[in-house]
Amino acid sequence: MSNISDIILASSSQTRKALMDRLGLTYRIISPDIDESPQGETHADDLAQRLAFEKARVVSAQYPNSIVIGSDQVAWRIDLPKQFIGKPLTIENAMAQLKQNSGQTLCFSTGLSIQHLASGFEHTLIEHYQVKFRVLTDAEIERYVTTEQPLQCAGSFRCEGLGISLFESMQGSDQTTLMGLPLITLCKYLRQLNIQLP
């Protein structure tokens, strides 16, 4: 495969941008315009995988000679696998989510799609990460939400910040999966496209 230098992150997420920056690559950001609501999916894996693929495909269709990276994440409780946990958007919803998930285990299904249409390269997959919340008091929840305001975060926490203090344990092979962009897997596929890392 010839050397491909144009990389596009198909995302408007500041967290995914910060993760991508860790790789030290030159890339651009283009926000895809897709419908992110469930389309009959009954499992978080199916929804996250479809959204990651569609985000990358919408941008790839416009830039077929570029490597396009799409990612999406869906959270769900282990005991309620068909009930997706979205972004809270308000302080009240964030506090309610944390109260409901206190002492529970959440799984994060993170979809990743890497596409280079000109060469026919396309890999779309799911990575998982689990967190077990401590039993949280109402005062802890209120202090956390007031301090960090995780209103755009599925599950109502930022693990890269103070949110780490809410957990009893974490389980997964790549913590960046929990943050929304599995870098270990992404690097594997970028190397297949002759992107030098490191």
Curated annotation (Swiss-Prot):
Enzyme nomenclature, EC number: 3.6.1.9
GO cellular component: cytoplasm
Stored Pfam families: Maf
Compartments where located: Cytoplasm
GO biological process, one term: nucleotide metabolic process
Residues at the active site: D72
CDD domains membership: Maf
GO molecular function annotation: nucleoside triphosphate diphosphatase activity
Cofactor: a divalent metal cation
Catalytically driven reaction(s): a ribonucleoside 5'-triphosphate + H2O = a ribonucleoside 5'-phosphate + diphosphate + H(+); a 2'-deoxyribonucleoside 5'-triphosphate + H2O = a 2'-deoxyribonucleoside 5'-phosphate + diphosphate + H(+)
InterPro entries, A to Z: ITPase-like_fam, Maf-like
UniProt cross-references to NCBIfam families, sorted A to Z: maf
Function (record text): Nucleoside triphosphate pyrophosphatase. May have a dual role in cell division arrest and in preventing the incorporation of modified nucleotides into cellular nucleic acids.
Entry's family note: Belongs to the Maf family.
Protein name stated in the entry: Nucleoside triphosphate pyrophosphatase
Taxonomic placement: Bacteria, Pseudomonadati, Pseudomonadota, Gammaproteobacteria, Moraxellales
